[in-house]
Amino acid sequence: LFTGRPDGRNVGIAARAKQELEGFVTEPDHRNLEYVTDPQADYDGIAEALLAPRRQLRRWLMEQGLTLLPGSTLSLGDTERFERSDPDNPYHSLIEATYGTAVVTASIHINLGIDNPAELFAALRLVRCEAALLLSLSASSPFLNGRITGAHSQRWLQFPLTPERVPLFLDHQHFITWTNQQIQAGAMHN
C-alpha cells in the first residue's frame, strides 16, 4: 500500500503505521507498507480479513490529512531515490541494490491457508500455472515518474529476478533442495 496526500504526492509513514496499527509491517522503502492477515481456510472470511485493515488504515491516515494511493500512482513520486525505512537493515540494502529505486507497484501476497504440505504444493503448482493470468488481471502500474512506460505493468518489467528456470515443485523437500542449490550458486538470496 502506498500512502500520501490527496493530490497524489507520496508521503512515507510505514514505520509510524507499524508502531501504531496492529498487523502492519514496513517495506524497504518507507513509502510502501503492508499488512499481514491470519491464514483463512475458507472463503467466507477472506474479504473482511483483507478489507478491515484497509479501513483502519484509511481512518488513521485521514486524521493526518493523508490517504491511500493506488499502486499505479507512485510514479508521481521520485523514483530516483530509495527512501529507506531502516537504513541499517542489510535486506533493505539488497532490495535497493537488486531492484533499484523504481519500486512502483503494490501487491497482495496470498496465503493459501492449507495445512497439508501435499495439498499446498498441488495448489502452488496450480497458482504458478495461472500466475500470468492473475498478474495480468491485478498488476496495473503503467506509469513511471509521470510518464507512460509502454507496459501494462512496471512490476512485470522488473520483478521478479529469479533464476531462468524454476520447476513446478513436486513437494516441500524438492522446494527446499532447489532453493538451497540456488542460494549456494548465488542465483537467489536468503
Please identify what each model-predicted range represents.
Residues V36-D38, H109-G113:
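Residue-level recognition of well-ordered beta-strand positions that form the cores
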Residues A102-A106, G113-N190:
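Loop-rich catalytic cores of soluble enzymes, especially ATP-dependent carboxylate-amine ligases
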Residues L1-Y99, V104:
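Terminal catalytic/cofactor-binding subdomain
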